[in-house]
Amino acid sequence: MDWGLTYPAHIHSWKWVSYGEPKGFSHYMPYDTHMIGSDIYQTLALVLEHTKKMKVGPGITNPRSRIAPVTANSMATLNEIGPGRAILGISTGNTARRAMGFPASKVDEVRECVEICRKLFKGEEAPYDEGPDRWMKEHRHRYVKFLNPEGGFYNLKDHIPIYVAASGPNMLELAGEIGDGVILFGAIGESFLNYCMEHIKIGAKKAGKDPKKLYILVMTAFYIPKKGETLESKEVKRAVGPFVASSLNLTALALVNTETKKMATAKGEALPADVRKGIMSFSDAYAVEEMGMERRHLKLYSEYLLGWKEEHDPLVTPEMIKTSTLTGSAEEIRDTIHRMESQGVNQVMIQPILDPNQTIDSFHENVISKY
């Protein structure tokens, strides 16, 4: 099992990522959420400079906020700084886009972006299209490629794997089809993880791939309750609640009504019955109307994934905490990870919500060193 760290991209995160490296953490893939955190690529460049072997990449970026040729350039430049240590994590950008008040990218946009980046990473020409839009009246079809591959500007010699993040059935299947790996959000509970893995397998088989060869990474939060604390304690909810709300909101928003094909009336039929109601209760976790459409996201996504919101208290039940996070005794958490490994998971990636160094120390002492 590999161990990783994630966080909203923070320009000073190299300090605690470098602290975590000798304690067994080998990957760092922060969120590329532009209005919430620092710039992802400046953050990752600093991490590469201050670590020895840490593999890094956006966890995740999206094709709407950053066009494919620019993403490919950013990744190839990271690959020059840390040869063989760059991983491209990409998906629809639910949080990054919604934090600006706009919808996420479409599934086909992700497919196209991955195809373009993969060709560019190989030093090949890639087709690239723009328009029509506000500034360009007609559609334009062009070809792009890296023009100075031998100049030390970027590294195309060391392979850059592409991990596709997914929550709903369509993206899970696309991830299995086109990804070198798959990033899952909060897929900890057995039935929930099995639901994800089954859809990943469908996509892999569609592409003629062996699903067992896909690298499966699960992002989550971690907390060992102190004496006297329960899963309903405020201390526990502050420690993992922000991740529970975020990850399960992403899952709920990724589903549509099987009859109307609309998100607004989704019932979550695709989800396992034992967690369906709890997960779908998060569909409106970030929905308030008093500020209006033009500004409501400015309130909704403040402190996103960082601070506890009291309005989420009824949603963050013990069942949902167990479904999406590693919360419990050290032995329970290790047993859960062993079970996840048997289901096909290759890496557990932790987001520190409280003090990063303390979280790293606790996870190392209670999990990594005894696994």
Task: For each feature predicted by the language model, list its residue ranges.
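N-terminal beta1-alpha1-beta2 module of alpha/beta enzyme domains
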Residues: 1-59, 160, 353
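Active-site mouth loops of central-metabolism enzymes
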Residues: 1-11, 61-69, 156-167, 222-225, ...
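Hydrophobic faces of well-ordered beta-strands that scaffold small-molecule active sites
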Residues: 3-7, 28-30, 56-59, 86-90, ...
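Acidic-and-aromatic substrate-binding clefts and catalytic sites of carbohydrate-active enzymes
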Residues: 7-12, 32-39, 63-69, 189-193, ...
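Acidic (Asp/Glu)-rich catalytic clusters
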Residues: 20-22, 44-55, 75-86, 176, ...
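Alpha-helix-loop-beta-strand connector modules within alpha/beta enzyme cores
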Residues: 41-61, 65, 113-116, 120, ...
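Conserved, mostly hydrophobic/aromatic
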Residues: 47, 78, 117, 175, ...
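An alpha-helical appendage that flanks or caps ligand/catalytic pockets
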Residues: 108-152, 193-339
